[in-house]
């Protein structure tokens, strides 16, 4: 009897101990932080990306790029600091994302793939792109998938494009292509541009951002249907993924994605082959003569000199002797009245013209309503520089009446062309204006500004531009050639 009781007591003690252990283990497991909680606790959102014009890069003003801007907004939503890390290639990106203690997510212009890799998951998509076969102008244009057979083709290793070609190879076993982890999209386009390879496969957004640097590249055909870009997250709980998806859905609904798309892609198609080729030449042959003047004005006025240089190029192609039938003259194409107001005694003197035009632009920008914030403020200032503040105000009022935001360039630029249509300008205070030309003016300046920002990164100074991966066709001289600089516009 006593032995039985003792046995029961021992069993009860064992069960109690086991229960306590399991309870503690359960509590410990329940208290393990989720992916979202870890980010919030650390106060840092670690994001891995690629270094390219379409994703992320650094200029003198700091970090920038479509993916950077979007990730920054997400970090702000979480109330944490954003920390950007860059990968050498896509395999490296996915490897770092999957390792324990790695980045919280990858924002790198990725199209969902790697279905066999359970360690990677993808968010909702946020930007539609189309994969495109790229060839060199002057070569025979492929028009269908079977035309790829026998061509020298290179794509990024580990990319969705490599997966697409692998699928095509099942249908055409003789198809050959190379995957490389030592190049980026910029390098692939350069190789096509100079003839080192025959073809490559890139997404439409990457081509849009880079084509101006490589005027010889052309789209052969779309290789498949449009697909959405997404962020990639490591496997684990859904807490951070749910927050990412909620953010992206809200960004789409509230217009953030459209504004970022307009900022980075809304002006990329303004240069054709001739324009891109000419700009590449002038970048090497003309800008060096006046760069110091732009930099001096930029420093004095606390304004990015490259934006001032972009205005100068749009106005005169950096020609100090430029004139027009309307009487504007000089590198910044100043009217006599504006020149006098800005203290310019000789409009044909490039230094005076740059100083006067720069001062005028900054003055216009400072006079805009405080409700207009950057970067829109600079785009509005460009519009006013071209069309005048009165007509710009007409367009803003028109936007407001249409239920649009009068402080957003994306909305107001839709109204400017109406200023040339009687049914609309008859209702405005200041009447007719060539608003469509102003939209093109702003788009052109923004595109030139983008190019200058990219090619004047710290690692691409001076003669390094000509030797960099950003190929400037036909331009390999570090010293400017002489030209008359007296073309009439």
UniProtKB/Swiss-Prot annotation:
It comes from the Bacteria. Keywords: Cell outer membrane, Cell wall biogenesis/degradation, Lyase, Membrane, Signal. Residues 1-32 form the signal peptide. Its EC number is 4.2.2.n1. PROSITE patterns: TRANSGLYCOSYLASE. In the N-terminal section; belongs to the bacterial solute-binding protein 3 family. In the C-terminal section; belongs to the transglycosylase Slt family. Murein-degrading enzyme that degrades murein glycan strands and insoluble, high-molecular weight murein sacculi, with the concomitant formation of a 1,6-anhydromuramoyl product. Lytic transglycosylases (LTs) play an integral role in the metabolism of the peptidoglycan (PG) sacculus. Their lytic action creates space within the PG sacculus to allow for its expansion as well as for the insertion of various structures such as secretion systems and flagella. This is Membrane-bound lytic murein transglycosylase F.
